[in-house]
Amino acid sequence: MSKKQEYIAPIKYQNSLPVPQLPPKLLVYPESPETNADSSQLINSLYIKTNVTNLIQQDEDLGMPVDLMKFPGLLNKLDSKLLYGFDNVKLDKDDRILLRDPRIDRLTKTDISKVTFLRRTEYVSNTIAAHDNTSLKRKRRLDDGDSDDENLDVNHIISRVEGTFNKTDKWQHPVKKGVKMVKKWDLLPDTASMDQVYFILKFMGSASLDTKEKKSLNTGIFRPVELEEDEWISMYATDHKDSAILENELEKGMDEMDDDSHEGKIYKFKRIRDYDMKQVAEKPMTELAIRLNDKDGIAYYKPLRSKIELRRRRVNDIIKPLVKEHDIDQLNVTLRNPSTKEANIRDKLRMKFDPINFATVDEEDDEDEEQPEDVKKESEGDSKTEGSEQEGENEKDEEIKQEKENEQDEENKQDENRAADTPETSDAVHTEQKPEEEKETLQEE
């Protein structure tokens, strides 16, 4: 037969061997499960006959009870002894041998640094550092003195964290080892400016400014223009002297500013050039603007919402007249203190970040407090005269209403009298109109 036929129809050969002379026989062996050493009945009988004392207290489920709430001071004081067991126990030199791996004699040590084939040197150094740190993570650091007696209270943790900032000698730069810390600032949010939205303006390519322009741009105004045909942003700047004065005035608080000093002072911002703008959306709180206050030793940060890229603008000849209409060559800017309404609107936005320092003020109460007593008396007298005038006007209105009602009644009576005479006249009118209608129908035919 061929190999193909073997897969289709395998041939079965008959086995004609004789039966063995002494075939095996199965023996019947009676077995009782009670006599086995593993039987539950035997264990119960031994447990009942002999007095067995439990070495470990067991509950109904034959389990050892472990209740952490019974440890005194575990949750209230957070005692490090009960939390971390034997981590902080100091061992003798003779007992440290017991902590090593029992298979240390059999293990073959391989120097990982020599394995350089198909691997870069930076990967080898990372694996060595990671291998060394795994053993250090398991062991807790032993502090000088009796560290076990200290409790992990909230106030204790805060004091230890704040104390680390006072020691400037121990701080090191993560990359530059030669750099040392000289001074520290407390990093806090600038809640006074959280009511405004801040952007990053980046001049791209040929739109970058010269050194002279950068010095004169201590204060500047960027005016965006958005139309259906095109959109751009215009940059305005002032003189170097005015920009320095304006910068100092803007940094002052509301209490320090005087309206008398700003009267008549106009800051002229002239248009320098226009730019094409492109807004780049970024995740919030990815970039911050930090303002340092050396007097108080505080660094205030402001979140920057998004980023705007400014590029050199090239205008088509078709749009040039439209651009000239919407461009402004000069902006005249003056400063003043905000009103109560404006301050309340800003404070409501600031309350989301600092509800304690920025609370809304009632506008009516402020107006009453600002007015002197003489003005209040005059206002009360005016209100009384206005009240008497209003009463006189109300009386006149009532008299006019009564006269109108009387006139309407007389007109209704006259209409009723006319209605009685109208039926006869109406019939006459209808009879006179019928022949005219008949004439019109004949003419149409």
From Swiss-Prot:
* Residue stretches in coiled coil: none
Keyword Lyase set for record = no
Protein's cellular compartments: Nucleus, Nucleoplasm
Which molecular-function annotations from GO does this UniProt entry contain? chromatin binding; RNA polymerase II C-terminal domain phosphoserine binding; RNA polymerase II complex binding
What are the start and end residues of every segment in region (Disordered)? 358-445
Which residues does the record list as Phosphoserine (modified residue)?
147
Quote the InterPro entries the UniProt record gives.
Answer: RNA_pol_II-assoc_Paf1
Q: Enumerate composition-biased segments (Acidic residues).
A: 361-372, 388-397
> Which UniProt keyword terms apply here?
Activator, Nucleus, Phosphoprotein, Repressor, Transcription, Transcription regulation
Output the PANTHER family linked to this UniProt entry.
Answer: RNA POLYMERASE II-ASSOCIATED FACTOR 1 HOMOLOG (PTHR23188:SF12)
Function description: The PAF1 complex is a multifunctional complex. Involved in transcription initiation via genetic interactions with TATA-binding proteins. Involved in elongation. It regulates 3'-end formation of snR47 by modulating the recruitment or stable association of NRD1 and NAB3 with RNA polymerase II. Also has a role in transcription-coupled histone modification. Required for activation of the RAD6/UBC2-BRE1 ubiquitin ligase complex, which ubiquitinates histone H2B to form H2BK123ub1.
Further comment:
Present with 1040 molecules/cell in log phase SD medium.
Quaternary assembly = Component of the PAF1 complex which consists of at least CDC73, CTR9, LEO1, PAF1 and RTF1. Interacts with FACT subunits POB3 and SPT16.
The protein's name is RNA polymerase II-associated protein 1
Lineage of origin: Eukaryota, Fungi, Dikarya, Ascomycota, Saccharomycotina
Q: Which gene encodes it?
A: PAF1
